[in-house]
Amino acid sequence: RLVEFFRGRSRLPFIERRLAGRTLKMLIDTDAAKNYIRPVKELKNVMPVASPFSVSSIHGSTEIKHKCLMKVFKHISPFFLLDSLNAFDAIIGLDLLTQAGVKLNLAEDSLEYQGIAEKLHYFSCPSVNFTDVNDIVVPDSVKKEFKDTIIRRKKAFSTTNEALPFNTAVTATIRTVDNEPVYSRAYPTLMGVSDFVNNEVKQLLKDGIIRPSRSPYNSPTWVVDKKGTDAFGNPNKRLVIDFRKLNEKTIPDRYPMPSIPMILANLGKAKFFTTLDLKSGYHQIYLAEHDREKTSFSVNGGKYEFCRLPFGLRNASSIFQRALDDVLREQIGKICYVYVDDVIIFSENESDHVRHIDTVLKCLIDANMRVSQEKTRFFKESVEYLGFIVSKDGTKSDPEKVKAIQEYPEPDCVYKVRSFLGLASYYRVFIKDFAAIARPITDILKGENGSVSKHMSKKIPVEFNETQRNAFQRLRNILASEDVILKYPDFKKPFDLTTDASASGIGAVLSQEGRPITMISRTLKQPEQNYATNERELLAIVWALGKLQNFLYGSREINIFTDHQPLTFAVADRNTNAKIKRWKSYIDQHNAKVFYKPGKENFVADALSRQNLNALQNEPQSDAATIHSELSLTYTVETTDKPLNCFRNQIILEAARFPLKRNLVLFRSKSRHLISFTDKSWLLKTLKEVVNPDVVNAIHCDLPTLASFQHDLIAHFPATQFRHCKNVVLDITDKNEQIEIVTAEHNRAHRAAQENIKQVLRDYYFPKMGSLAKEVVANCRVCTQAKYDRHPKKQELGETPIPSYTGEMVHIDIFSTDRKLFLTCIDKFSKYAIVQPVVSRTIVDITAPLLQIINLFPNIKTVYCDNEPAFNSETVTSMLKNSFGIDIVNAPPLHSSSNGQVERFHSTLAEIARCLKLDKKTNDTVELILRATIEYNKTVHSVTRERPIEVVHPGAHERCLEIKARLVKAQQDSIGRNNPSRQNRVFEVGERVFVKNNKRLGNKLTPLCTEQKVQADLGTSVLIKGRVVHKDNLK
């Protein structure tokens, strides 16, 4: 037995006290939770301990049965009698030091309490053991090696002298749907726990886990009891933060949690186990600075926020699991497993186990993480892990946990029914046909649609009938019976899968060599309860193979046992049932053999004996059906790629030994007829009963079957439309499942609604799929930001001012082509264009051309331009406004149509220039643009019906009224032509919108939009982050 941890320091502090004339040396040990004293005759008031416990030291394990009360530091505290103490007479633990308010000052070798200072004495030694309540059993062969490992890795264990560190490689964040603060009123603190709360807050502040807060967020707190007792026998307590409102706004972190069954199943050949529990696990993860305010809580008049990851957050377990997975990634599955803050180390022999412990502890030290000493269990041949007892023999239920089920009172409300089923379901792997047994109790939770309702009020009273009471008692009795030990799987050996199906449920037992590995079961859904017996039996096999895929994938041999002999025909090649054919194909993928085992039930106690089993043989295929060519079939009944489920009248045909007809109504408007026929005459007679001449009738069967009676079908139903469907897909009736399927398909590649519908129809069907797909696409934030808007929303065109004479309103811009720049101007009245070459876009280079334009049009009142920096410079705006009295109107950024007059001219100008270049009149860019401008001004404009150069001529003033009338008419025609497809939008202050990004910035993978908040609605534009954005640039 090894029962010591080494401090690794040479001087240990102690104090001396007198007891009835005897001097006691009392060790100050902040790592010990309780106080201990050696039994001496001077002790008085010795009394028995209410709950005896074991203490281990270097001298062996000792059971603590007695205690006494002693006054130390002016504080009365219990001391437990321990006769294995040698170097010291007593040990003073942390409980007494904390309660008495003792402050240690090791630098000055003193301590202080209640204003009294006392000198410390020191005991010099190379190393001293301390008492621990864990009984550590270590084989003699590795005792020294294990001791050296613990000394070398002692930093992995938390001590009260050290503030709890944190992992520097991980930063936790709290992503919420918005930044609106969550505030909840504080709960009143009970007076009886006020001191505990204050001490807890002080300790958290001291350790740097929390800090004072001024956050607008607030979550309330309360105190709950937790396992164990303190030195006085009182229940331990825990301070809990109620983060429920914050959790409602938190975006889920979809990090996959480990599968508990798979962890337990993979502990196969291990003989030794060690379990580690990380000290205040979540508090060892650093919380991002910008999210700390969200964790604010108030207690006893103070307000604080967490600097580390707190307990109770929605994503806390996912964040911590990811962190531990990163720390132990190279070891997980090989020497250890991790489930949140519970680590189990497993090995096949003693020396490997010491080495594995050393490896894991080193990884934790490297990650700056600490393990709780009190909860560590070393070198166990049987240990509790995740609510199960694991050992070299297998897995069994934890008696302590099962005891809670055995003593559970009969539920009297929905809440207690849910609680009992949840508790019992945790151990369903130990109960064969759990779903069938629990079915009467589960039915209590079903709503009107036959499905278990999550929204049923938990306060609804419940009174068990006799059937439900029997099911309740049976579950308790099974768990109270002798433990069933689940065997670890050996993946080199064959697996035996025993399945069974009843009218209400299906179940399976996976085993090897007669010993169960796991047991699974579930109740049948409403449509599945209508399956034929052979379909239910086959469903049990298919479901079990899928559910146990982690065990069976890649297995060399799988033997399937069933008690239903007619399954022989169900798995035969000649069976034409499409569903059964799909299931058989799935079974064939698993290299499985199906065997028939006589008997009404397959119990685990039967040891799944394989003696006297008859392998199922396929029956010889009949040649009765006449096979016609697919070509002839095409001329009679058209084959469609649509699944059968899409049609209002659905007929599924299959040849069988016995005639059978079943009618189903799906989605209130669709009829499905399942017909098993033996001969053609009976089939035609039955078809007359189910065929609907008013709609298209869909038929699903294989081509040879349809070919055998297609001519009779046409002859008997000459005016009826038929379609042959190749596929039948799964009907989805649950609305939430429909949304989940469409959303999952859309999120796969974010394609359009029609593509999503086609993809979903390959496997599923439900009505109104199109509208749901369009809704999902329309509400997809990713699509909004990443996709081009093929049908952008545009504001209605409004009436803009119409000039009355030439030069009253002009539009200017800078046109660039072939690395040449031109200042362009177009008169809104005459459409006359002016183009001036410029060297650059700077103020210096555009000022002179602007003055030339003003010289040509001396009566300019308004200049329209875009957001070119030079146009908006102080120099240019001051010159136009102050010197010439000209108003400047700027178009909203990234909305060229607001300056459409000149933008449209640029298109025409480039078009004329390209034509001139092809005519080889010149290759000089400047000359081409200037010549194109001349030709433009000489061409009749489509709106004014005049040549611009003639309208500018002084002699054209008499035609001004006529030209203005044409401008007004053109504007009205444009409004009438465009506005029917446009709609004005109004935005509220604070409304979130998507703003189109500048295409010239970023690359092809840059998001096309960013989400922003509206500050003000300006009519045709909105104000966002202090800048004007035209509504056409919003999605």
Swiss-Prot record:
Supply one GO BP term: DNA integration
A Pfam family cross-referenced in the UniProt record is RVT_1
Which InterPro entries does the UniProt entry name for this protein? DNA/RNA_pol_sf, Integrase_cat-core, Integrase_H2C2, Peptidase_aspartic_dom_sf, Retrovirus_Pol_polyprotein, Rev_trsase/Diguanyl_cyclase, RNaseH-like_sf, RNaseH_sf
Tree of life domain? Eukaryota
What Gene Ontology cellular-component terms does the record carry? DNA polymerase complex
Q: Does the keyword Kinase apply?
A: no
In its UniProt record, a GO molecular function of this protein is: RNA-directed DNA polymerase activity
Report the residue ranges that make up the Integrase catalytic domain in this protein.
Answer: 797-956
Enumerate the Gene3D superfamilies for this protein: 1.10.340.70, 3.30.70.270, Acid Proteases, HIV Type 1 Reverse Transcriptase, subunit A, domain 1, Ribonuclease H-like superfamily/Ribonuclease H
Q: Which reaction does it catalyse?
A: DNA(n) + a 2'-deoxyribonucleoside 5'-triphosphate = DNA(n+1) + diphosphate
Can the keyword Hydrolase be found in this entry's annotation? yes
Q: Which UniProt keywords apply?
A: Endonuclease, Hydrolase, Nuclease, Nucleotidyltransferase, RNA-directed DNA polymerase, Transferase, Transposable element
Domain Reverse transcriptase: residue ranges: 205-390
Documented EC number(s): 2.7.7.49
Kindly give the PANTHER family that the UniProt entry links to this protein.
PROTEIN CBG26694, PROTEIN NYNRIN-LIKE
> What protein name is recorded for this chain?
Retrovirus-related Pol polyprotein from transposon gypsy
* The organism of origin for this protein: Drosophila melanogaster
What gene does the UniProt entry assign to this protein? pol
